[in-house]
Every structure is written in structure tokens, then in C-alpha cells.
């Protein structure tokens, strides 16, 4: 994800410098397509190989069982987080840090409330669910800010 974000960040900065909305749209479309392939690939690989990697890291059955129980959250993580991380880089490339600040403000409040509620009902599953839901919320918020990028190209 970092490589995709780094390339997108520099190309978005170039689009802003030239005030080229078409380049912005192209970078966004291509980056999201590449990201979709990455998300599917990494999630499938993690699902298929989770037992191998868990057993490679520990030979304690109780630790392996716990890791296996919570591995679904690691498989879901790229699905929840990658779009937000890509858009975070794009907003940084344009210099639109207000959107990032606003997203982080909402995400921190959401995380605090969500973990208090979900951990009391679901225990450790609650914190893992909170973690993924917070990343998903960050992605959604940054998607909602996409129309505001057009002001940089007038």
C-alpha cells in the first residue's frame, strides 16, 4: 500500500501543480484499481497461509489457537483500511490536510466510544472489531471529502 500511496501522492501533487483535473481523475482511478487487486490478493494470501505463519511464529498451542481465533480481523484489515490510506496520501500530496485533521478527530472519538461499548460486550473481539471499524470509517470519511479536491483545480 505504501508504494501505491507514494506514487499517487507525487502524481496528485503534479496534477495540482498543473491544475490538471484529468490527471487527478486518472491517478485516482488507476490507484483504486491497483489497490483493489492488492486488497484481494493480500486478503486471499493471508486467509490461505494464516495457519502456516501462525505455526511459524509459535509452537505454543494456546497462542496458536488465540492467533487463529483473531486472524479474521487481520484478513479483513486491508479491506477496511487500504482505501483510507491511499486517500490519506492523496490528500497529503495536494496539501489538503484539513480533511485529514477532520477525519482523525472523528475517528478518535469513534474509536474511544466504540471500544468502550464493544469491549464490554465482546471482549477482545470488541477491540479488534473497533480497530477495523475505525479504519473503515476513516476510509468512508476521506471518500466523502473527494468532491472538495476540485477546488484545488480551478
Identify the function of each model-found stretch:
Residues 97-101, 127-128:
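Alpha-helical transmembrane segments and their helix-entry boundary regions
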Residues 33-37, 41, 73-76, 102-110, ...:
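Hydrophobic residues within alpha-helical transmembrane segments
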Residues 17, 65, 108-140, 144-147, ...:
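Membrane-interface helix-loop junctions in multi-pass transport and translocation proteins
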Residues 41-68:
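Short membrane-interface helical motifs at transmembrane helix boundaries
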Residues 1-48, 83-95, 99:
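Small-residue-rich hydrophobic transmembrane alpha-helices
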Residues 17, 49-51, 58-60, 93-96, ...:
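Short helix-capping/hinge motifs at transmembrane helix termini and TM-loop junctions
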Residues 1, 61-87, 102, 112-113:
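Alpha-helical transmembrane segments of multi-pass membrane proteins
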Residues 7, 44, 48-52, 85-86, ...:
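Transmembrane alpha-helix boundary/anchor motif
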Amino acid at each position: 500500500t505504501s508504494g501505491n500511496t507514494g506514487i499517487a501522492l507525487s502524481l496528485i501533487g503534479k496534477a495540482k501543480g498543473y491544475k490538471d483535473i484529468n490527471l487527478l481523475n486518472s491517478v485516482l482511478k488507476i490507484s483504486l484499481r491497483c489497490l483493489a487487486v492488492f486488497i484481494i490478493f493480500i486478503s486471499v494470501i493471508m486467509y490461505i497461509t494464516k495457519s502456516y505463519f501462525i505455526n511459524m511464529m509459535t509452537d505454543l498451542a494456546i497462542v496458536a489457537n488465540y492467533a487463529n481465533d483473531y486472524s479474521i480481523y487481520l484478513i479483513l484489515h486491508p479491506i477496511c483500511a487500504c482505501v483510507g490510506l491511499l486517500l490519506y496520501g492523496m490528500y497529503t500530496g495536494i496539501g489538503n490536510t484539513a480533511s485529514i485533521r477532520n477525519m482523525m478527530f472523528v475517528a478518535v472519538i469513534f474509536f474511544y466510544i466504540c471500544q468502550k461499548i464493544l469491549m464490554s460486550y465482546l471482549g477482545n473481539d470488541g477491540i479488534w472489531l473497533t480497530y477495523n471499524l475505525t479504519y473503515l470509517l476513516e476510509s468512508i470519511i476521506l471518500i466523502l471529502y473527494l468532491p472538495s479536491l476540485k477546488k484545488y483545480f480551478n
